[in-house]
Amino acid sequence: MTTKRKPYVRGMQPNWWTKLGFYRFYITREGTCLPQLWFSLVVLFGVFALKNGPESWAGFVGFLSNPIVMLINIVTLIATVFHTATWFKLAPKAVNIVVKDEKLPQEPIVRGLWGLTIVVTVVILAVALIV
């Protein structure tokens, strides 16, 4: 048996996610993809500038020295650190590591991830300064 009545569809406001802190946090975290897109485009532009010779590279460096670009890059760095911190807090929840019949606490995993990040960053900076 079918009916000709329309089913009730509850209205959804465009700002529904602002009412709960969890959703605001989630949308903010997922919104960090926009600064990551900026960073990816800047790196891609830099690679092509490097490929096209010294004049092109000088133009790219000039572009990076623009105060607005510096501000956008600082915002991108902050967004990246925020995204990394939240990701490192989520990672132990997805991994179930058992040591001697006990689940490994989250803190050693998070500390290990931050330690690895610091080591890799120092190695990359050292290589960049040596070469």
UniProtKB/Swiss-Prot annotation:
Localization: Cell inner membrane
Keywords noted in UniProt: Cell inner membrane, Cell membrane, Membrane, Transmembrane, Transmembrane helix
Pfam families documented for this protein: Fumarate_red_C (PF02300)
Entry's Gene Ontology cellular component terms: fumarate reductase complex; plasma membrane
Family matches, as SUPFAM superfamilies: Fumarate reductase respiratory complex transmembrane subunits (SSF81343)
Membrane topology value: Multi-pass membrane protein
Chain segments annotated as transmembrane: 30-50, 58-78, 109-129
Coiled coil: none
Primary localization class, coarse: membrane
GO molecular function: succinate dehydrogenase activity
Assembly information from the UniProt record: Part of an enzyme complex containing four subunits: a flavoprotein (FrdA), an iron-sulfur protein (FrdB), and two hydrophobic anchor proteins (FrdC and FrdD).
Function, in words: Two distinct, membrane-bound, FAD-containing enzymes are responsible for the catalysis of fumarate and succinate interconversion; fumarate reductase is used in anaerobic growth, and succinate dehydrogenase is used in aerobic growth. Anchors the catalytic components of the fumarate reductase complex to the cell inner membrane, binds quinones.
Protein family membership: Belongs to the FrdC family.
Protein name as annotated: Fumarate reductase subunit C
Gene from which the chain derives: frdC
